[in-house]
């Protein structure tokens, strides 16, 4: 029977839960994992220092104050990656996902998923690939990137909460490698906009990379039924959403099915 070793970090005003799975955890392994956790914590701290709109000295906060002046820090590779991908996402979603709300650059809606995915690929995946652990995951406020060794039978069992009753589960997914992101009305931020009435109260999307599915879940909240259906079919999305009309809408590889919510 496998065992779990979990850690919780607090960064970006939210908890990050890191979980490791293996049959046994000896002292040497635990010491090594403690060092990995320290590295992840340092990395998330750097991400926060670069991208937090609440820190006056962050690169994001200084982004619109530079005018035509260029500073070396803004050539930071991660900053450039997030900026370029945020612009791309805005175009791909026809502005439903917008990192320039109120006229200022703020990629908060993209950064969390991207940071979790990046930290996973940088610190957790090598442990899995080298059979140091059997499986690993990083979960940030319900959005997660998970992985499992190719020769392992272990799967991550992920329950999707009912937004109206957090003690109930509306769906369960068994995943070895991939990402899960959930967006809801209560999580809706100013980095997204909608010209339509909100029809979906919660959207969960499952895929390969968290930076992608996190954006898609956000778009699902602000899209009307027709726009979202086209988006699901075009991108062959998998997941589940709840509508205000008490409909549970399941989509798998772009195919959509409505089920009355009980």
Where are these regions (language model features)?
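Mature catalytic core of soluble alpha/beta enzymes
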Residues: 1-262
């Amino acid at each position: 029977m496998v065992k779990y070793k979990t850690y919780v970090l607090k960064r970006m005003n939210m908890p990050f839960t890191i979980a490791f799975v293996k049959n046994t955890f000896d002292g040497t392994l635990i010491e090594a994992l403690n060092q990995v956790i320290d590295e992840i914590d340092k990395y998330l701290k750097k991400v926060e220092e670069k991208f937090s709109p609440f820190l006056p000295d962050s690169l994001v906060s200084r982004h619109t104050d530079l005018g035509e002046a260029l500073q070396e820090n803004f050539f930071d590779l991660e900053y450039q990656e997030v900026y370029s991908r945020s612009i791309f996402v805005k175009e791909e979603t026809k502005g439903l996902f917008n990192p320039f709300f109120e006229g200022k650059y703020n990629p908060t809606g993209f950064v969390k998923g991207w940071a979790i995915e990046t930290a996973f690929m940088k610190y957790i995946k090598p442990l899995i690939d080298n059979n140091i652990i059997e499986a690993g995951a990083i979960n940030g406020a319900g959005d997660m990137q998970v992985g499992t060794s190719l020769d392992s039978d272990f799967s991550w069992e992920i329950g999707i909460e009912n937004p109206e009753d957090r003690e109930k589960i509306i769906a369960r997914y068994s995943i070895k490698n991939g990402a899960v992101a959930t967006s809801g009305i209560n999580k809706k931020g100013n980095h997204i906009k909608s010209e339509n009435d909100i029809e979906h109260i919660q959207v969960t999307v499952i895929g390969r990379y968290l930076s992608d599915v996190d954006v898609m879940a956000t778009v699902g909240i602000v899209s009307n039924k027709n726009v979202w259906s086209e988006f699901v079919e075009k991108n062959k999305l998998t997941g589940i959403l709840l509508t205000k009309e008490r409909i549970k809408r399941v989509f798998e590889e772009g195919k959509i099915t409505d089920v009355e919510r009980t």
